[in-house]
Amino acid sequence: MTRRHFIGFSGALMGSALLGGCGGGDDDAPASTTGAATPSAPATPADPIWGANGAATNIIASLNGITQSAFRAVDYPVEAYGAQPCPVVAQTSPYTDLTKSPVSPGAGATPGAGAFDSRPAFLAAIAACSAAGGGRVVVPAGSWYCAGPIVLQSNVNFHLSANCTIFFSPNPADYAKDGPVNCGANGNLYYSRWQANDCLNFGAPVYARNANNIALTGEGPTSTLNGQAMTPFAGSGNTATCWWTYKGSSGAYGCAGSSTPSQAYTNPNNVDLKTVAPGISSALYTLLTNPTTPWQQDQNYLPALSEAGVPVAQRIFGLGHFLRPCMVEFIGCTNVLMENYHTQNTPFWQHHPTDCTNVVIRGVMADSIGPNNDGFDPDACNNVLCDGMVFNTGDDCIAIKSGKDLDTEYGAAQNHVVQNCTMNSGHGGITLGSEMGGGIENVYARNLTMLNQFWATNSLNIAIRIKTNMNRGGFVRNFYVNGVTLPNGVSLTGGGYGSKLLTGSPINATVPLGVASATAGNPSASQGGLITFDCDYQPAGDAIRTRPALVQNVNITNVTASNVTLGSATGSCFQAIVAQGPVAFDYNGAAPTPAIPAITGVTISNCDFGTPVAAGPASTTTPGPIYAWNVNGITLQNVKIAGQLYNTTITDAR
């Protein structure tokens, strides 16, 4: 592989033959002399990340006070405020295509008709607890129905007992009936973020804003928050409407196609951008109304409002729109604890703290496989510990974010530690991005078991993932991963972005998947890579592409992946490393085009990546185990791929 525009290797590929003469001592070495002075061994340098005064250790230490014992030792039982348990009945999914509409855990039960709404009692107990100086609001064992958001207040620990399930109303109207902002026909809404863009929208089932010292806790996996996002609230049969219908995936969860109201349908309630942003320039208006990203769709309209500089108070969604709320969303809060409970059937992202400082999430099971059901998405937060979580998700297990488009007012996501977690299924095990406009820095991860438990039917797509594009921009700095075990590998099937790539781009689907030639490439960036750097994430989905991303100082060590056999394929992944740097073609802003930085400063060491399906030599028609485009030095040290040892540097100048 000597082509400058494929992968430039410098260094050595080491096999067992290289070690053939090293079985004994050196015949020319001087004999030891009895009684001679022995030089002192050099001191072992302290681990700068996990050592006693390491960066990650200091973050963990700074969060030692975020515990349940920090709350006043006074309980407020919700039954004392009028809460009543509800009967539960069996529920059968109306959706018959289980390939497109798989049944999520917890979807087989729902409160019986006429169930008592305990939400007023929950809110009354929270208010009393906070007013008295704080304590613990306790929901006892049993099943409870809640028709709207549980809004936490300062100094309150909202606690689910063992064998306690709160079933939230599946009806979107219940999350727009009494929020703090009266938005007329759109309902009474909540300040929120949807895919890292600020807006007024449906309230999250568990919500807080500008609160201090709050906790959501339980006693293990039987303490359950069930969002009932798969439970229909209208219609019947295969066209019944539930929260997940709003994704707009044809044939999935009641979506019959483009005419079904969803985030991806032409919404007549979205007014022309010149009306809502009268000062918009003609150049910006042209970009935002490009038919490739139809502005009338809610999923494109909100980013367009951000790019046009429309104030958040005028970005009104809720009723008449189709942007799903997160399950747990805390905004602008300090000292946040989420511990020892179980989420199921969530409308959107399962946990979304935004602009929060001092966040601990520990022992939580994120267990929902619907569309966009990420497990934990801290957004522009500072000082975060994610410890001992278990993930079974419909999207990324962990995705660290920091705003999108012009919504980067909260700055970077920084000082995060992720440790001791298990990833059973999902798109990415640990992901940075894609919404990372404010940047991401100082992220430390260790001891992750990416079990990929359902590898035969619902495989983990990627283990370690960075994703951004010319719209998201931002930066990744100081990302350290140490110790990832993948006993069942990741997806053996590669996957690219197809129609989400830009027409005319050198990155396009006419190139065989996983191949980079001197002039074109097609990364397997959506699935199949153990480690994926993707700086060209679905570029056709964004109208504005003017912000190149910077990825630098990434260190990954001690990753071990084992092979599995699925059908005729045996392997640990499709490709071991997928490194797609920024693509200059994507830029669509004013001239001149800014500098387009390559991925730089990456070290991968002491890893055994098993055997990729694409294990053979790379060519212009056949993928090899490594894909690289616009990369300035990925150093491999003691990295084994398909039995071959790599000590080399990967470079691909563009």
Language-model-detected regions and their locations in the chain:
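Active-site proximal loops enriched in glycine and acidic residues that flank catalytic Cys/His/Asp
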Residues: 380, 402, 432-434, 466-470, ...
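Predominantly polar beta-repeat domains that present long G/T/S/D/N-rich surfaces used to bind, process
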Residues: 567-574, 579-580, 587-654
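Short, recurring structural edge motifs at helix starts
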Residues: 144-145, 204, 373-375, 405-408, ...
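Short glycine/acidic-rich loop motifs that flank beta-strands on beta-rich extracellular proteins
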Residues: 134, 147-148, 169-171, 228-234, ...
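Glycine-centered low-complexity coil/loop motifs and glycine-rich tracts
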Residues: 23-26, 434-436, 467-475, 497, ...
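Extracellular "leader-to-stem" segments immediately downstream of a signal peptide or signal-anchor
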Residues: 2-157, 161-332, 339, 348, ...
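Right-handed parallel beta-helix
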Residues: 162-163, 212-223, 334-344, 357-368, ...
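Short, T/G/N/S-enriched strand-turn elements that build extracellular solenoid repeat scaffolds
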Residues: 126-129, 146-153, 349-355, 388, ...
